[in-house]
Each structure stands twice: as structure tokens, then as C-alpha cells.
From Swiss-Prot:
Protein name: Universal stress protein C
Family: Belongs to the universal stress protein A family.
Gene3D superfamilies, per database record: HUPs (3.40.50.620)
Organism: Escherichia coli O6:H1 (strain CFT073 / ATCC 700928 / UPEC)
Name of the gene encoding the protein in the UniProt record: uspC
Cytoplasm among keywords: yes
Length: 142
């Protein structure tokens, strides 16, 4: 089976390169499309900050996340069609994006670091609720 529209769940960590490389290896032979989804930290968890500072912090976190995605894409050696930056529960966003954009494969990482522990938990929810195939990739740290 070949996949032509792949969604990759990445984190702002070096291990995300492994996930994107896996997506490229699947998409390249069929000239498939790749998109990325990630979580941005929500500054509201720092509720002791004043409201104006929260908005500034949210903007900074959004910019840093986008910069990471831009660098990841630049290093991929394959075009990435879309990026999605989500807040909140990753699995809900993955399922919603899959429905709206007709992805046929979701790639997630399995790692012990905090994001990937959450992502692995999210992957479990995606696997049980997804209408498309899900590939869980074991990640190794550098």
C-alpha cells in the first residue's frame, strides 16, 4: 500500500528529524504530500503572568515553534505542503486535521521525553479513533 498524503506529528526536539525522514522515505517514491503538526506551549499555564505578558509570550512561543518547523522543512530535502501549530490536546487536533485535509497516514513518535510521552499517549488515542493508518516510529536520542 502506498500513502500519498502524510501528516507527521513533531515536537520542537531533534528527534523530529527522524519522523520527517521516515515520512520522506514513504512519500518520495510516490511523489506524496507531507504536512506537519505540532503543539506549541500554551503560556496560560504560567497563570501568574499579567494578561498583556501572556499575549506577548504566546506570540514568542508561536514564532519559535514556526522557526523550528521552518528549519525542519529546510533540512528535509523534500517539500512540506502545510504546517499546523496546535494548542491543547494533540490527538484531537490530529483527528480533526485528518478529517479536514484527507490524510491517509499519520506518523507519530514513541519516546520517553515529556512531549513524546504525551505524543505516545496521544498516538494511542489517535490509533483507537483514527479512520486512517497510524505509524508509530521508535525514536532514538542523539
Amino acid at each position: 500500500m502506498s500513502y500519498s498524503n502524510i501528516l507527521v506529528a513533531v515536537a520542537v526536539t531533534p528527534e523530529s528529524q527522524q519522523l520527517l525522514a521516515k515520512a520522506v522515505s514513504i512519500a518520495r517514491p510516490v511523489k506524496g504530500h507531507i504536512s506537519l503538526i505540532t503543539l506549541a506551549s500554551d503560556p496560560e499555564m504560567y497563570n501568574q503572568l499579567a494578561a498583556p505578558m501572556l499575549e506577548d509570550l504566546r506570540n514568542v512561543m508561536q514564532e519559535e515553534t514556526q522557526s523550528f518547523l521552518d528549519k525542519l522543512i529546510q533540512d528535509a530535502g523534500y517539500p512540506v505542503d502545510k504546517t499546523f501549530i496546535a494548542y491543547g490536546e494533540l490527538s484531537e487536533h490530529i483527528l480533526e486535521v485528518c478529517r479536514k485535509h484527507h490524510f491517509d497516514l499519520v506518523i507519530c513518535g514513541n519516546h520517553n521525553h515529556s512531549f513524546f510521552s504525551r505524543a505516545s499517549c496521544s498516538a494511542k488515542r489517535v490509533i483507537t479513533s483514527s479512520e486512517v493508518d497510524v505509524l508509530l516510529v521508535p525514536l532514538t536520542g542523539d
